[in-house]
Design a protein with these regions (language model features):
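N-terminal glycine-rich anion-binding loop in soluble enzyme alpha/beta folds
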Residues: 1-52, 116-156
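Charge-patterned, long linear interaction tracts outside catalytic cores
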Residues: 160-188
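Gly/Ser/Thr-rich loops at beta-strand to alpha-helix junctions
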Residues: 71-83, 98-101, 115-119, 183-188
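Short, acidic/small-residue loops that bind anionic groups at enzyme active sites
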Residues: 85-107
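Non-catalytic positions within long, well-ordered alpha-helices that form the structural scaffold/packing
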Residues: 62-68, 106, 173-175
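Short active-site oxyanion
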Residues: 68-72, 91-92, 178-182
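Glycine-rich, highly charged phosphate/nucleotide-binding loops
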Residues: 45-63, 160-168
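N-terminal active-site wall of soluble small-molecule enzyme domains
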Residues: 55-59, 75-85, 89
Length: 188
């Protein structure tokens, strides 16, 4: 079986089984490639450096394809912003974000839970052909989740992150009771 390539942000936080950055999350071959110098802050930025991000994505997509990857994914849902550009630049098929699933969930009332509600913009949804008015909920900026995954912490309090995620999902559904499906933007 030929491998899937994973474009990884340059991070140091723990990656537990289930995280896209942990090889144990897959029962097929994967190749990881760290985009040196491109971290969580770059990907989740309110105003990302688009030329720098695209250059890193292109360079690393080409390298993964040269290593034999037959398709690519990424370690950050915010990279949805570059889906259409990367489709043109990559020598192999690419799926940048779980947000791509929204368009396939026709007939569902979809909400999105994200690492940063304030930085997930209509442009991210447009880049994956999803409705711009999709309800969005986020984890708090002062959360254990943010300490680990947005601020690149060295430790992970799994229980705290679970509580925070469940609370954020409940708050999203309480605010938008029509939601019957939640897509998680974040791969962590």
């Amino acid at each position: 079986m030929k491998p899937l390539g994973i474009l990884m942000l340059d991070t140091r936080f723990p990656r537990i089984v289930g995280d896209i950055g942990n090889p144990g999350s897959f029962d097929y071959p994967v190749i990881f490639r760290r985009m040196v110098g491109i971290g969580s802050k770059d990907a989740v930025a309110a105003h990302p450096d688009r030329p720098r991000m695209l250059a890193a994505l292109k360079e690393n997509a080409e390298a993964l394809a040269a290593e034999g990857a037959v398709g690519l994914s990424t370690s950050c849902g915010f990279l949805a912003l570059y889906q259409k550009d990367l489709e043109k630049l990559s020598p192999v098929p690419v799926a940048t974000s779980a947000l791509l699933h929204i368009r396939s969930l026709s007939g569902k009332k979809v909400g999105v839970l994200t690492a940063s509600a304030e930085n997930l913009t209509p442009a991210h949804f447009a880049a994956v052909d999803a409705p711009a008015d999709t309800p969005v909920g986020g984890l708090p900026a002062d959360s254990s989740f943010a300490d680990t995954f947005l601020r690149n912490g060295l430790t992970l309090d799994r229980d705290a992150v679970e509580r925070e995620t469940v609370a954020a999902a409940r708050a999203l559904v309480a605010k938008h009771p029509q939601i019957d499906t939640i897509v998680f933007e974040c791969t962590n």
